[in-house]
Amino acid sequence: MKLSKIKKVLSGTVSALMIASAAPVVASAADQQTRGNVGGYDYEMWNQNGQGQASMNPGAGSFTCSWSNIENFLARMGKNYDSQKKNYKAFGNIVLTYDVEYTPRGNSYMCVYGWTRNPLMEYYIVEGWGDWRPPGNDGEVKGTVSANGNTYDIRKTMRYNQPSLDGTATFPQYWSVRQTSGSANNQTNYMKGTIDVTKHFDAWSAAGLDMSGTLYEVSLNIEGYRSNGSANVKSVSVTQGGSSDNGGQQQNNDWNQQNNNQQQNNDWNNWGQQNNDWNQWNNQGQQNNDWNNWGQQNNDWNQWNNQGQQQNNDWNNWGQQNNDWNQWNNQGQQQNNDWNNWGQQNNDWNQWNNQGQQQNNDWNNWGQQNNDWNQWNNQNNNQQNAWNGWDNNNNWNQNNQQQNNWDWNNQNNWNNNQQQNNDWNQWNNQNNWNNNQQQNNDWNQWNNQGQQNNDWNQWNNQNNWNQNNNQQNAWNGWDNNNNWNQWDQNNQWNNQQQNNTWDWNNQNNWNNNQQNNDWNQWNNQGQQQNNDWNQWNNQNNNQNNGWDWNNQNNWNQNNNQQNAWNGWDNNNNWNQWGGQNNDWNNQQQNNDWNQWNNQGQQQNNDWNNQNNWNQGQQNNNNSAGSSDSLKGAFSKYFKIGTSVSPHELNSGADFLKKHYNSITPENELKPESILDQGACQQKGNNVNTQISLSRAAQTLKFCEQNGIALRGHTFVWYSQTPDWFFRENFSQNGAYVSKDIMNQRLESMIKNTFAALKSQYPNLDVYSYDVCNELFLNNGGGMRGADNSNWVKIYGDDSFVINAFKYARQYAPAGCKLYLNDYNEYIPAKTNDIYNMAMKLKQLGYIDGIGMQSHLATNYPDANTYETALKKFLSTGLEVQITELDITCTNSAEQADLYEKIFKLAMQNSAQIPAVTIWGTQDTVSWRSSQNPLLFSAGYQPKPAYDRVMALAK
């Protein structure tokens, strides 16, 4: 049964999709077909023989579609590359990003789809399906590929004498199919992801599949065969250029392969970790920004940690665990205490790292054998020349590398020179170091022996020294007088950070600046408590958030892949590694220390108080805001808002409080988040909708406590509203209810939500609410149909919209403005539909404003098109809010231009525009993250668009 089905599916797919191309193939006269281009994206809908019902409504990088009782159906949108006649490799890294609500009911799948020519080939990257997984058991198994957090099975199937781009032909099909579907049958699946298309192409080539042809297209495809279903493709983007995303896989670039070929399967992850590997430790949801990525890419962790041993950064930095900063710098109140003294004072490596707790089962063995840390640092007993004595050639690389490659384990082993028989190679090559030398004492334990925030050295001496000690003198230059203080006297961080006084050691004594506030205290201040280094780096489980070196022009790209740290250190400049113009400020701009390390949780730290680094980030939450904040700059025009998810409220707290006086919960007030099915069934009597604000609680409390106004989003929406809400007894299997019952449910949902907000958050300013969201099709066809909206299915007309606004007007708190919100609102036909509904509601006295979501791109719409829609909405006499602004781009200058124009329009019409909301805080958390659509990049780094927008308000 399945085999016959797949043959029909494949046949239908081929004939369908070749019609979508610019090939000399003509659809059957009986076929239903629409094709076109919107905003630079090609689209097509095809319904074989015109059977059943099928529709597609395209927008700029988005579309909706539905099908029922069809033979074969597809709807697709993407980019066509045929005119360029190039192999896929010529385009760099091709990435497709999608945000889709996909509802398959039977045989259907959602995939990335396309062709190559010369030779002819058709391909699929399948993300989800309904009741059958393509391509069944047909074809040859070609292995697997792991990409973007998923594992895909690779198959090759053949089509013989079938329709194709080039007429009837015989050609292969290549498949990557997720081992676990991203969707389930007979339900709405909220699918959001990024597909590294190039990585699949590379994997196919590596598996022996011919990828020599010219790329024809890359599209997102929704397909159905003898089934029903629908999809709301909220966004699809195809970008190319740049380097391929390793997806956290590291491919051939892991510790073993790059720098330690003798370790076999004992890579860095296994080496110090057991069940808490290095990836886990540093990759708390950071996607591509784990330490492996950062410390790998032809520059392994050894290089990273011993870069200081290569000129400025050594194991001293890396291994400070249980000895606080004060002690470290002031062993016995020695103000000029240098690195030599640091490791001495009877505080050898055993004592220093293990507090007498590890005995003979760990680093004690590794770094000791009667060769304590002092000896390691002072091979020649140069107590006053520390690193100079150790680094006679100003370069650890010269001592421990061949061909400028940090391969400790091949020649001149560090331990062979310095450690008797217990060399570093042994430590790295014990085939699971933990098992042989650590037993159950893994790296996390070693790093967290009483620490909480694993140490300053680890960051500081890996980040800053090159900036201050340039020109091939590394540790010698830094440590000429054996004094940490000297490092900061003449080459202060201040020089790189304007007025942010980095000079910890003004009095040549850390204690003078920090008093008795040691590093542990500094990191914990009652704020961090049990937050260890893992948490410190990943406070918010950010995706590429925080210290996103890889997104800050990661050093491998700037600093020769073949030249390891020598390549980086030849110029002895951290700036070169972390920034383009040897200026940390170029990359960090306003990204303060507190933001990076503490994400708003170190407010009262001495560091903040002593060094002013966090000048712009400390509780800047007055209503007007400072002039260097968005809300401050635009305070005389309108509120500045953003959308947030709860996970960002801790890590980004200071950033949010500084820049925004309005917050929209990204998902937590949508119907699926607030409707309580269990309570509805127990207490609802089939009509009284029960509400829970538990998922929104953290966001609501944050707004209330910090005086930030709330934009509610949303009550009535065809999407993210559970099907059971429309059925008898609030049951998934019940019949759909009548209009009368639905009216009662709608009224009680709105009434109970406002009541809960008032009772649970009495001081919260709910200043506006999206009552209805995304009602209309993109083509001027009016409201969505019953096949795409349960509201329309039950009501059959727009009466539910009128009722929703009526109930909201009745129950909303005083001062809360009621909005009709929609996207692609600048498409002229849709502009008219929104305008007409708004005027209808205005005549009834139920509406206050129109929400323009404003999901834009630099290539569509232009500012004039947008202004036309804005003026149409303003002509209603209602308020207009820009509610979800983002602008995708491939060119930051073009993005800055359009942001400037949109803000200028808003400022010119601020009498009717009370708020502008940016849909997200930083690119890495955006739903369109692959196209960098926001004002801030990873780590809350201001972009050119931010600068242009801020300049408008001056």
UniProtKB/Swiss-Prot annotation:
Q: Which Pfam families does the entry mention?
A: Glyco_hydro_10, Glyco_hydro_11
Q: According to the UniProt entry, what is the EC number of this protein?
A: 3.2.1.8
List keywords of the entry alphabetically. Carbohydrate metabolism, Glycosidase, Hydrolase, Multifunctional enzyme, Polysaccharide degradation, Repeat, Signal, Xylan degradation
Which SUPFAM superfamilies does the protein's record reference? (Trans)glycosidases, Concanavalin A-like lectins/glucanases
Biased-composition ranges, Polar residues, are 233-243
Which residues are catalytic?
Answer: 122, 223, 774, 884
Q: Kindly state a single biological-process term from the GO annotations of this entry.
A: xylan catabolic process
Compositional bias (Low complexity)? 246-622
Region annotation Disordered: residue ranges? 233-628
User: What task does this protein carry out?
Assistant: Xylanase domain releases more xylo-oligosaccharides and GH10 domain more xylose.
The record's catalysed reaction(s) read: Endohydrolysis of (1->4)-beta-D-xylosidic linkages in xylans
Give the family per the record: In the N-terminal section; belongs to the glycosyl hydrolase 11 (cellulase G) family.
Residue ranges of domain GH11 in the record: 29-236
InterPro entries given in the database record: ConA-like_dom_sf, GH10_AS, GH10_dom, GH11/12, GH11_AS_1, GH11_AS_2, GH11_dom, Glyco_hydro_11
Q: Where is the signal peptide?
A: 1-27
List the protein's name: Bifunctional endo-1,4-beta-xylanase XylA
Q: Which residues form the GH10 domain?
A: 624-952
UniProt-recorded Gene Ontology molecular function terms? endo-1,4-beta-xylanase activity
Pathway connected to this protein:
Glycan degradation; xylan degradation
